[in-house]
UniProtKB/Swiss-Prot annotation:
Intrachain S-S bonds: none
A Pfam family that the UniProt record links to this protein: Ribosomal_L10
Function: Forms part of the ribosomal stalk, playing a central role in the interaction of the ribosome with GTP-bound translation factors.
BP GO terms, sorted: translation
GO cellular component: large ribosomal subunit
Keyword set includes Ribosomal protein: yes
Molecular function terms from GO: large ribosomal subunit rRNA binding; structural constituent of ribosome
Keywords on record: Ribonucleoprotein, Ribosomal protein, RNA-binding, rRNA-binding
Known partners and oligomeric status: Part of the ribosomal stalk of the 50S ribosomal subunit. The N-terminus interacts with L11 and the large rRNA to form the base of the stalk. The C-terminus forms an elongated spine to which L12 dimers bind in a sequential fashion forming a multimeric L10(L12)X complex.
UniProt name for this protein: Large ribosomal subunit protein uL10
Family named by the database record: Belongs to the universal ribosomal protein uL10 family.
Taxonomic classification: Bacteria, Bacillati, Bacillota, Bacilli, Bacillales
UniProt-listed PANTHER family: 39S RIBOSOMAL PROTEIN L10, MITOCHONDRIAL (PTHR11560)
């Protein structure tokens, strides 16, 4: 087998592993972004813990078919880049959506969230969700509210009794 074919097979395996393991995968068309804009986007994604790579569409199609995500193939036309996140489902959608608002050249095409194909509208909806940390902080504040209210009520009663006794 030739060296080129072996290298392509390794890339297909790499893409297939990333598609299989990632919680969130977003396909974007980066045509029209300047080098500085692309660098800024990569930096923002890296800070969010998201891997951003450009692969040949033909290799990505083979990888998608091998992990039974062939429905992704219809979005693999033109120059594409793929953002993978193994930890946070929301992070790639949020970073890419925010960047696309400021840079019209970046076009979100589709994504795969936990193995399910999602459209542009669904990616935008996911981008508006708070991150995992944000959701946990909301949950904690909801859980703390009754205790805080009880403590404040008890304190108010104690202060009222002090005023009446003084």
């Amino acid at each position: 087998m030739s060296k080129a074919i072996e290298m392509k097979q390794q890339v297909v395996t790499e893409i297939a592993d990333k598609l299989r393991e990632s919680k969130s995968t977003i396909v974007v068309d980066y045509r029209g972004l300047t080098v500085s804009e692309a660098t800024e986007l990569r930096k923002n994604l890296r800070e969010a813990g998201v891997e951003f790579k450009v692969y040949k569409n033909s290799l990505t199609r083979r990888a998608a078919e091998s992990v039974e995500m062939a429905e992704l193939n219809e979005f693999l036309t033109g120059p594409n880049a793929i953002a993978f996140s193994n930890e946070d489902v929301v992070a790639p959608a949020k970073v890419l959506n925010d960047f696309a608002k400021d840079h019209e050249a970046l076009e979100i095409k589709a994504g795969v969230i936990e193995g399910k194909l999602v459209t542009l509208d669904e990616v935008k909806a996911i981008a508006t969700l708070p991150s995992r940390e944000g959701l946990l902080s909301m949950l904690l504040s909801v859980l703390q509210a009754p205790i805080r209210n009880l403590a404040l009520a008890t304190k108010a009663v104690a202060e009222q009794k002090e005023e009446q006794g003084a």
